[in-house]
């Protein structure tokens, strides 16, 4: 048997000045907020008989906070939102090996959200173990996303009556390990169909978040990694996505290639990423897409068993790009620090 129990807690205090444009007057209010999040997670796995694995688990999440505007002219505050929510979930996963060639996976999760209710989430799959360390998998599963506090309660177009987004994913994949694991490659084919997607209805005044969007995607993902020797390794992956309905921050094409070197205490890696057709806005009639290339470089030096130095450069080509319309990403960025592992 095996299992684990984990707990986390974090909080934040924020004061934001939205600024003002050239020729405009400074705004009088400042956004303020206090937020917190805590969670508890437990699972236990057991083998009941040969080839079997049964896992039971429970998750609890508490989150929320208080947001308000503070006015400088007279010092008064106006509430924006003061909400706290809880999510409780239990799940069971079952895995059974049938001989040496087939593995069956099935599971179900029930999630209760204090604002939007209860959701059942089933999934299942088959894995066929083929000769030469090859595996063919077929999977189907339900997915969902609960609306956020911001979407329901903070700023127009908030809507407290939003429901979860839902989808079903069908996936067929093939992977293989060759040359004692030095070469690994694989490919994925998938189809996603969903509804209740949260969109902003701009035909009303003020605009309002509603559950009327749809998602229907299909695509291909391929990956390959090769360990040349004890010092060098390379990897690459590519994905193509067809979207019947545009999805925010989703690219039509994504290509990645990277190489890494390590010897003794030293390590260095670099990668190049090409993005084409990334939707930064999906508003009907005003869709926007971005194309860009990102080059990153990272180096590290191990000081001792538990500490290492690192230096990193991101977007070294200083590309101007956005992931969400109106929010430009940084150009070339450099950082460094110390990693400590306990």
Predicted regions and their residues:
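Transmembrane beta-strands of outer-membrane beta-barrel pores
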Residues: 9-13, 60-66, 86, 108-114, ...
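Residue-level signature of outer-membrane beta-barrel architecture
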Residues: 1, 44-48, 86, 95-96, ...
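Face-selective signature of the C-terminal outer-membrane beta-barrel domain
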Residues: 1-116, 127-129, 183-189, 235
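Outer-membrane beta-barrel "beta-signal"
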Residues: 127, 171-173, 329-342
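Extracellular loop and loop/strand-boundary signature of outer-membrane beta-barrel proteins
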Residues: 22-31, 43, 73-81, 107-112, ...
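Gram-negative outer-membrane beta-barrel transporters
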Residues: 97-100, 104, 189-193, 210-280, ...
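Residues that define the transmembrane beta-barrel architecture of outer-membrane proteins
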Residues: 34-38, 84-88, 118-120, 166-170, ...
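Outer-membrane beta-barrel signature, preferentially recognizing the C-terminal barrel domain
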Residues: 33, 83-85, 135, 139-194, ...
């Amino acid at each position: 048997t095996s299992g684990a129990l984990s707990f986390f807690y974090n909080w934040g205090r924020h004061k934001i000045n939205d600024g003002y444009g050239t020729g405009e007057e400074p705004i009088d209010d400042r956004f303020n907020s206090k937020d917190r999040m805590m969670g508890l997670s437990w699972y236990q796995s057991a083998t009941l008989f040969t080839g079997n694995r049964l896992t039971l688990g429970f998750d609890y999440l508490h989150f929320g906070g208080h947001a308000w505007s503070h006015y400088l002219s007279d010092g008064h505050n106006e509430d924006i939102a003061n909400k706290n929510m809880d999510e409780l979930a239990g799940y069971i996963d079952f895995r059974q090996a049938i001989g040496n060639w087939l593995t069956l996976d099935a599971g179900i999760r029930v999630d209760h959200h204090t604002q939007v209710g209860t959701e059942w989430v089933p999934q299942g799959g088959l894995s066929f173990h083929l000769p030469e360390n090859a595996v063919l998998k077929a999977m189907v599963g339900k997915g969902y996303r609960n609306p956020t506090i911001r979407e329901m309660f903070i700023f127009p177009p908030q809507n407290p009556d939003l429901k979860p987004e839902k989808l079903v994913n069908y996936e067929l994949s093939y992977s293989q390990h060759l040359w004692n694991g030095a070469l690994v490659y694989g490919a994925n084919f998938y189809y996603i169909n969903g509804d209740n997607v949260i969109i902003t209805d701009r035909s009303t005044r003020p605009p309002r978040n509603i559950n009327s969007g749809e998602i229907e995607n299909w695509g291909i993902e391929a990956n390959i990694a090769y360990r040349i020797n004890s010092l060098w390794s390379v990897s690459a992956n590519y994905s193509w996505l067809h979207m019947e309905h545009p999805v925010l921050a989703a690219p039509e094409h994504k290509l990645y290639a990277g190489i890494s070197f390590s010897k003794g205490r030293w390590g260095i890696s670099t990668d190049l990423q090409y993005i084409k057709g990334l939707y930064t806005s999906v508003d009907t009639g005003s869709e926007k897409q971005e194309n860009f290339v990102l080059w990153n470089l990272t180096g590290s030096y191990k000081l001792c068993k538990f500490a290492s130095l690192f230096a990193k450069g991101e977007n070294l080509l200083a590309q101007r790009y956005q992931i969400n319309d109106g929010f430009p990403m940084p150009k070339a960025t450099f950082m460094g620090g110390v990693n400590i592992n306990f």
